[in-house]
Design a protein with these regions (language model features):
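Short loop/turn segments that connect beta-strands within beta-propeller blades
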Residues: 3-7, 43-47, 123
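Short, solvent-exposed beta-strand-terminating loops
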Residues: 49-69
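A short beta-strand motif characteristic of beta-propeller blades
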Residues: 8-13, 48-51, 86-92
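Short, well-ordered turn and helix-capping elements at secondary-structure junctions
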Residues: 6, 15-17, 57
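Repeat-blade elements of multi-bladed beta-propeller folds
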Residues: 11-39, 63-82, 92-118
């Protein structure tokens, strides 16, 4: 958070993943979408995490396996070349519920969209 008049940083808090959206602030709480598929509510004055919500799609675990013949694999996908794996990893990160949009707060409900194709409404 920054002081609107001076631009000086008031709160700087390390998150679990990148945050590309602007926070929605109401009642002293800053709500922000995170690239790892969680929506975080933080105290606007201290940056303390108050609660978070994880999208269902972001809970999918697609662990990497290096097979005996030195191929990276993942369900339905196999690679002959390890250089292809980072490209898939980037695709997976964007396609499993990442939150790029800024949330909206109205009538006590937090609305946000996710790359899993859903619009969420949290009370």
């Amino acid at each position: 958070m920054a002081d609107a008049a001076t631009g000086k940083s008031l709160v700087r808090q390390q998150g679990k993943a990148y945050m590309f959206s602007s926070p929605a602030i109401a009642g002293g709480v800053a709500i922000i979408g995170v690239l790892n598929g969680t929506l975080e509510a933080r105290d606007a004055n201290t940056g303390e995490l108050l609660w978070d919500y994880q999208t269902d799609a972001s809970k999918q675990n697609s662990g990497w396996v290096l097979t005996a013949d030195h191929r990276f694999n993942q369900p339905l996908l196999f690679f002959d070349n390890w250089r292809e794996a980072p490209l898939l990893a980037q695709d997976r990160q964007v396609s499993v519920g990442s939150i790029f949009s800024s949330p909206l707060i109205a009538n006590g409900v937090v609305y946000f969209g996710s790359t899993d194709g859903f619009l969420y409404a949290l009370e």
